Amino acid sequence: MTEKQVFKTTWGGRPLEVEIGQLAKQANGAVLVRYGDTVVLSAAVASKEAKDVDFFPLTVNYEEKMYAVGKIPGGFIKREGRPSERATLTARLIDRPIRPMFSEGFRNEVQITNIVMSVEQDCTPEMAAMFGSSLALAISDIPFDGPIAGVDVGRINGEYVLNPTVEQAEQTDIELTVAGTKEAINMVESGAKEVSEEDMLGALLFGFDAIKELVAFQEEIVAAVGKPKMDVDLLQVDADLKKEIFDAYYNTMKTAVMTEEKLAREVEIDKVKDTVKEVYAEKFSEHEEEAQLLKEVKQIAEDLEKDVVRELITIDKIRPDGRKLDEIRHLSSEVSILPRVHGSGLFTRGQTQALSVCTLAPLGEHQIIDGLGVQDSKRFIHHYNFPQFSVGSTGRAGSPGRREIGHGALGERALAQIIPSEEDFPYTIRLVAEVLESNGSSSQASICAGTLALMDAGVPIKAPVAGIAMGLVSDGENYTILTDIQGLEDHLGDMDFKVAGTKDGITALQMDIKIQGITEQILTEALDQAKKARMEILEELTTTIAAPREELSQYAPKIEMIQIKPAKIKDVIGKGGETINSIIDETGVKIDIDQDGNVSIASSDAEMIKKAIKIIEELTKEVEVGQVYLAKVVRIEKFGAFVNLIKGKDGLIHISQLANERVNNVEDVVKLGDEVLVKVTEIDKQGRVNVSRKALLNEENKEK
């Protein structure tokens, strides 16, 4: 039995402990990460043989176990089901910095599983899982060029904070996750409250310093317990064969690549590849290693396209569609595309097009987020759909995949910063982005279309937001940064760096790369170039619609907010919801009440809203000493009569307060059902109300 080994350090001021050798020993590599009281088991496994595929088959899973926070899953079967949106996003977050750290041509299937077993809310399980995933690979026999590490960075009052607590996260104006190796950053995910490029770069470098410490800690562990790496067969091609094909077809491929229109370009490129494969299929038809050689020919044909595109950009400074390196494709935008929806915006950038639709609903329609974190809700929701027809293909349709969930979340982060507060705009807001055409940067097109749809719907956003995707082609020593990358440049380039923001600053950032890291200089230049492009796109958006519409759509619900005392909530709701349901039945409105007494009344009929407000005001009206009421007698007792002052509140007229003269029998003065004028004379400590008819009679006599 392998002896358990424990390694300790601190991370963001909290203890970080790694256990190896006791759990999951049949995996190629496994570690138990303890970060404070957060515990994550990370295990990495690789197939023994390479798969016959033209991509690296890596899968990262992040499994949230409800027992980690002392909960039993809801629903009938009482067990965890499909991953939550947060789990899906976390799996993507871990995958992105790890994927570039495998050798090109490695085709063994690799699966990394992270099981969240215990959660302390202030010690993020996501970052513990990223750390564990890297370390499980690093100590295993799986070929891996890591380790990598990731950290969360916030900023409070101008000071950067490492791995903010739940309380600190509510105060921060930057929410950044950054990952990398000890040499360079290779993944970024961020939301921010309109911060400058300089401040965002500062946050990245602050996080990078912490990353280097975590990587050094992993290297110590690998030196102590790491396994020798397995020998694997990487797909390699014959150098002479590659030179022969490149010499024969380079110029033909260059002509094909420079076809301006996307679909036509794809046809021309495929023609060249097919020609290469056909010629060499015939040439090698009698060769004893025909299958292997044809596999190499297929790879060389792909390499030919890649090299042509990259050399065009880095050497000739020409892009496949003829644009300059910092040139944005043709822009166009429209609003009010759909007649019955609450708001819509269409944004087109070259051959990428997104239609965004805004729907407004009462606050009660907000989304509840119930997972391993603190239970929360959100009233702004952004969804992204990518149908296959957008790229001229057939394919799977149905529930969103990881990519769609990730792009939707990026758009939500970018736009959430400019959504008005609940007090200023008491609506739940849902944006749905339908990608209708795609040739790169569709997530950023959805952000631009979302801005248009919000303004068309009359949402009083703080400022318009635009997004742009930056690219990179690097040969190690030299690099070229591209503005507004199209699909081919994304596919064959080294970086996809998405930047969204207003004219005043960045609201969202996402970076993925295919190389093992990028420098501070590249980050700085990419951010500066992105800012220039963002301003150009914002000008297009505000030319189409300069400001949010002053009136909501006639089809949007009208919402009024009123405030009642929290103690009065029970009076509005009534026993078993009887009172509130009667108001809803009578008026047809939708009513939402929070624990602070904020009442939202929604309906398409403004008159019914007014009626509901009047009823609620009557229900919650306070009885005050000195007020006069026309009250109805509801009960007779020997000592006096009980009268109803307002709905839900009765008062007592003591027999001595019925008249100026002595009264022996209450019913000599009032009878059940009578209406009498009374004045409130006292409200005792128990809330009981005493009223007097006699006091009003005396006042009348004085006036006479």
Curated annotation (Swiss-Prot):
Its cofactor is Mg(2+). It is an enzyme of class 2 (transferase). It catalyses: RNA(n+1) + phosphate = RNA(n) + a ribonucleoside 5'-diphosphate. Residues 626-694 form the S1 motif domain. Keywords: Cytoplasm, Magnesium, Metal-binding, Nucleotidyltransferase, RNA-binding, Transferase. Coiled coil: none annotated. Its EC number is 2.7.7.8. GO terms for cellular component: cytosol. The keyword Signal does not apply. Mg(2+) binds at D490, D496. Belongs to the polyribonucleotide nucleotidyltransferase family. This is Polyribonucleotide nucleotidyltransferase.
